[in-house]
């Protein structure tokens, strides 16, 4: 079942799903879509082992944030397996996430693999503030985690947003993801000031705890016609230690097309990917010398495909299976990955997760499996025949996974424990779960080398280690012959 909360630019998506035999509802707004979801849930038999699948395409990013952070009512979650998104969020996942069986026309943010010893970092520059800009930014923050940060915490992914009124967008983003930004480095520059200054925000526990957020942010109040912006774009495009991607996301599609071809020339010469948000996935045929602008890539709603979400959920169910396997081991048994995946129990285990927020945690994990394989030099063409990781690869990816998880949890509304709460848990480990469930304070939101033992006496990093061990198994089980 597909429920869409707005007809705006969603007709191609609805038509494809109807043609595939899916039940499709198009509602007038998010409230009507949620009401439709509840009505359909009421028709379902709660005793059925397999729940009805629903892909819920919302209009407002705040509605999506609310569902991801707080979930749905239990009567809906018991009967319907919901994967909520917006068309902007779906499009961002289509662009940034590498999945089995699904070819992407877009280059990865990390076009060259970033290993532990690499000195390069990913830099995403978003021009224009809109719902699509926000979706690209948040999905990049969920995906772009690399091993070299583990060696040098200065090597963070950077997300820069440039807009004539970026300060309003920044404030809304920070208010929505307050715990992410409380614990991140970000700077703001207003080029409209007479003497622009970089105003720097530092993590709330800087110099008290080790750095654990591997994404930093930059908000520039200006546009691509500012000399300072053009100079920076040129510098970044020539920097061999940056893997730069530029995305135009103004609400005005014609402005995106115009500005995508007005960047400093080194950007085109260096073949820096320039993503241009348009209505019909096409750019105007305005240049006789198309090769000079071959790195300008249009993207639009026609590329939204529910198959992206279907594959993500398929992977996420297997991630959940690995976690369940680890927690099913007897006390004293070493935590390790399973040797196979029992596909007969995937749906029932997914239902037993019992929380939409926890399901998103598995989905966000699944979004980075391809990026992790890329960081150890394995491209999608290798996935089918790659059976196991070396112990060194597992060690590296385990730390990357913790860093990824930390950003995910901050996005989902969790925060690190305060010094007082840390003392409480240090004295009584049973308080860890209570604080997590009642205050959304997570004891494990800390640097990798500061992770502690859980109630079983094992360091919590063993679960990430088992999951990384299982990456080839998870991916191979989703590859079609």
Language-model region placement:
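Cytosolic regulatory regions of ion transport systems
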Residues: 1-342, 347-404, 408, 413-422, ...
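In a subset of proteins, long, contiguous C-terminal domains/tails are tracked
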Residues: 427, 432-434, 439-481
């Amino acid at each position: 079942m597909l429920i869409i909360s707005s007809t705006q630019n969603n007709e191609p998506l609805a038509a494809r799903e109807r043609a595939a035999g899916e039940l499709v509802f198009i509602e007038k707004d998010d409230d009507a879509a949620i009401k439709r979801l509840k009505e359909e849930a009421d028709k379902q038999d709660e005793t059925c082992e397999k729940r009805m699948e629903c892909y819920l395409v919302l209009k407002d990013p705040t509605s999506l944030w609310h569902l991801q952070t707080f979930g749905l009512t239990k009567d809906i979650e018991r009967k319907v397996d919901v994967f909520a998104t917006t068309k902007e969020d779906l499009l961002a996942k289509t662009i940034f996430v590498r999945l089995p069986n699904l070819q992407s026309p877009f280059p990865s943010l990390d076009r060259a693999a970033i290993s532990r010893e690499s000195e390069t970092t990913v830099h995403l520059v978003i021009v224009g503030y809109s719902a699509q800009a926000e979706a690209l930014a948040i999905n990049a923050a969920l995906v772009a985690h690399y091993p070299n940060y583990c060696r040098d915490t200065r090597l963070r992914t950077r997300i820069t947003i440039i807009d004539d009124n970026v300060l309003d967008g920044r404030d809304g983003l920070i208010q929505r993801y307050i715990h992410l930004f409380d614990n991140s480095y970000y700077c703001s520059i207003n080029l409209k000031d007479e003497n622009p200054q970089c105003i720097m925000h530092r993590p709330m526990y800087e110099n008290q705890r080790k750095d654990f957020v591997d994404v930093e942010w930059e908000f520039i109040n200006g546009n691509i016609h500012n000399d300072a912006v053009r100079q920076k774009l040129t510098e970044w495009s020539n920097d061999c230690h940056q893997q730069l991607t530029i995305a135009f996301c103004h609400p005005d599609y014609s402005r995106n097309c115009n500005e995508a071809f007005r960047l400093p020339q080194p950007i085109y010469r260096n073949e820096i990917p320039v993503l241009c948000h348009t209505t019909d996935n096409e750019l105007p045929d305005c240049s006789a010398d198309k090769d000079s602008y071959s790195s300008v890539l249009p993207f639009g709603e026609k590329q939204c495909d529910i198959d992206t979400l279907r594959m993500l959920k398929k992977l996420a169910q297997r991630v959940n299976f690995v976690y369940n396997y680890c927690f099913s081991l007897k006390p004293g048994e070493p935590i390790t990955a399973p040797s196979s995946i029992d596909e007969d129990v995937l749906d029932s285990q997914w239902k037993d997760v019992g929380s939409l927020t926890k399901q998103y945690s598995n989905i966000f994990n699944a979004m980075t499996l391809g990026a992790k394989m890329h960081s150890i030099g394995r491209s999608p063409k290798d996935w089918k025949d790659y059976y196991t990781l070396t112990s060194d690869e597992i060690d590296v990816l385990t730390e990357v996974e913790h860093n990824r998880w930390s950003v995910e949890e901050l996005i989902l509304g969790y925060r690190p424990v305060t010094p007082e709460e840390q003392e409480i848990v240090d004295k009584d480990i049973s308080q860890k779960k209570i604080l997590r469930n009642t205050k959304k304070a997570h004891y494990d939101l800390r640097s990798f080398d500061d992770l502690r033992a859980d109630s079983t006496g094992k360091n919590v990093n063993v679960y990430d280690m088992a999951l990384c061990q299982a990456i080839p198994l998870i991916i191979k089980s989703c590859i079609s012959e």
